[in-house]
């Protein structure tokens, strides 16, 4: 599973700045689910090929009342969710009682944590370490989050304590063996296609899982996938292997009630990252709400293939159904590539059709195409609709190749690629999607400029070549002097 790292500390010690730098965003709110994650922000981050989920929390002072008290509780909950904690302190302000209170809480919870002395601009790092040594958190790692100083050392120390997932280890092995660093994922012998069932509480996720497993379900084992109780359920259907990742847990038949489910953002985000295909469940009677858009946005950021299931469709009036379909077109335009199914998980209506869309989305996400095929599609697209002119010169796109999968990454080489407008990129994306008949998966397009491979390189001359060059230059100067004298 993708590790979870939480940023905790007093107010104004630089947690949000650190969050923005590690997630490489300005607002850094990737999974800000209002009402469910009050004062906790979730970001999808990576460092030197290692992926992780980052949680930004509100400040803790120890004397909160009212709303501040609730926000502090959310920060302490983030500590419980995390695999590792970055405890930030302000090197300029020095150690405070609030810092000591947080350190004591981390010790009581026996939480893996590292002390980070932020804002060391113009401060001796050794002095900063000595200042916070009485807290008993080990040597503080000095950083300047706003400038990026010390971040490399910090992340190396943190990620060295966290386990790698199988895909990262396989990719590292490929690189070590000199293989091309492009891994095309596929279903494993054991797991098959991994499907994450996600959605807001009470939309019928667990009911759908049990319905899809069927009366005579084939379950090899049910075991917790993480300490946060995500359940991995391998099973077979029509000879195909699958694994459900159920964040709410599967309840036995007869015990499923549409009670309020405990909603864990971390479990949902981890399930998305670990899945091949996401089935996104929505409540047809409530329509599209902002929480749905936030969750879909994270699945899209993660590049996962998506199938949308609109549950509780039975019993709705024709006018209500027409309104919901109009809202889907209006608000879910950014995932218009995903199949939408109108189902009743309780009665089983339309549920069987989900498997066909899961298979199609997965195949679209992981299929490999040769460079010749992708280049031919590019040439046809350019012939039909030329790129715009830039400073009187036409943008030239030369060839394309596959750079990765799940989602498909198409790398296009050419000149002036930095000037390609977003509208033309969308045109190319739609062209590839139409010609390759892709469904259910996002496509990413990356451009490479026509760089001169010899730029900045200079041959080292031998002594003999240096002497020859010197003689030629001397001869040239003498000849030039004679021509001037004749004039």
UniProtKB/Swiss-Prot annotation:
- UniProt entry tagged with the keyword Repeat: yes
Per UniProt, the keywords (alphabetical) are: GTP-binding, Nucleotide-binding, Repeat, Ribosome biogenesis
Q: Which PROSITE patterns match?
A: G_ENGA (PS51712)
Pfam families named in the record: KH_dom-like, MMR_HSR1
Query: Gene3D superfamilies attached here?
Result: 3.30.300.20, P-loop containing nucleotide triphosphate hydrolases
One molecular function GO term is: GTP binding
- Stretches the record annotates as Disordered: 448-487
| Residues in KH-like domain copies | 367-451
One Gene Ontology BP term is: ribosome biogenesis
Q: Binding of GTP 2: at which residues? A: 199-206, 246-250, 311-314
Residues bound to GTP 1: 9-16, 56-60, 118-121
Q: What does this protein do?
A: GTPase that plays an essential role in the late steps of ribosome biogenesis.
How it assembles, according to the record, is: Associates with the 50S ribosomal subunit.
The protein's name is GTPase Der
Q: Which organism is it from?
A: Pseudomonas putida (strain ATCC 47054 / DSM 6125 / CFBP 8728 / NCIMB 11950 / KT2440)
Organism classification: Bacteria, Pseudomonadati, Pseudomonadota, Gammaproteobacteria, Pseudomonadales
């Amino acid at each position: 599973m993708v590790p979870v790292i939480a940023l905790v500390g007093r107010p104004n010690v630089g947690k949000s700045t650190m969050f923005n730098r590690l997630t490489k965003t300005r607002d850094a709110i990737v999974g800000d689910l209002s009402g469910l994650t009050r004062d906790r922000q979730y970001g999808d981050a990576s460092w030197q090929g290692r992926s992780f989920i980052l949680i930004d929390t509100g400040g803790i002072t120890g004397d909160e009342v009212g709303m501040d008290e609730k926000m502090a509780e959310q920060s302490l909950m983030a500590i419980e969710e995390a695999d590792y904690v970055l405890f930030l302190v302000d090197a300029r302000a020095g150690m405070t009682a609030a810092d000591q209170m947080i350190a004591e809480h981390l010790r009581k919870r026996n939480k893996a944590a590292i002390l980070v002395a932020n804002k060391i601009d113009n401060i001796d790092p050794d002095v900063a370490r000595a200042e916070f040594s009485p807290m008993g958190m080990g040597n503080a790692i000095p950083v300047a989050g706003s400038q990026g100083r010390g971040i490399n050392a910090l992340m190396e120390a943190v990620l060295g304590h966290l386990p790698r997932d199988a895909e990262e280890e396989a990719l590292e092995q490929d690189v070590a063996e000199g293989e091309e660093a492009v891994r095309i994922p596929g279903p494993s012998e054991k797991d098959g296609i991994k499907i994450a069932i996600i959605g807001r509480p009470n939309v019928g996720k667990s009911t759908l899982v049990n319905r899809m497993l069927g009366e005579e379900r084939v379950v090899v084992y049910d075991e917790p996938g993480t300490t946060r109780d995500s359940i991995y359920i391998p099973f077979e259907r029509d000879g195909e292997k699958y694994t459900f990742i159920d964040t709410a847990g599967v309840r036995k038949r007869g015990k499923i009630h549409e009670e309020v489910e405990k909603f864990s953002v971390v479990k949902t985000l981890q399930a998305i990252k670990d899945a091949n295909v996401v089935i996104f469940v929505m409540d047809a009677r409530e329509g599209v709400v902002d929480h749905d858009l936030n969750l879909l946005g994270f699945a899209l950021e993660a590049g996962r293939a998506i199938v949308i299931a609109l549950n509780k469709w039975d019993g709705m009036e024709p006018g209500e159904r027409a309104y919901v379909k109009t809202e889907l077109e209006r608000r879910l335009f950014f995932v218009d590539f995903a199949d939408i199914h109108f189902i009743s998980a309780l009665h089983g209506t339309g549920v069987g059709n989900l498997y066909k869309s899961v298979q199609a989305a997965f195949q679209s996400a992981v299929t490999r195409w040769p460079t010749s095929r992708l280049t031919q599609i590019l040439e046809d697209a350019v012939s039909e609709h030329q790129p715009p002119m830039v400073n009187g010169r036409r943008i030239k796109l030369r060839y394309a190749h596959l750079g990765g999968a799940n989602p498909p990454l198409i790398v296009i080489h050419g000149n002036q690629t930095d000037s390609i407008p977003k509208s033309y990129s969308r045109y190319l994306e739609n062209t590839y999607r139409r010609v390759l008949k892709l469904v259910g998966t996002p496509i990413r397009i990356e451009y490479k400029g026509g760089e001169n491979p010899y730029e900045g390189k200079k041959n080292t001359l031998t002594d003999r070549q240096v002497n020859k060059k010197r003689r030629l230059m001397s001869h040239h100067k003498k000849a030039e002097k004679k021509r001037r004298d004749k004039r």
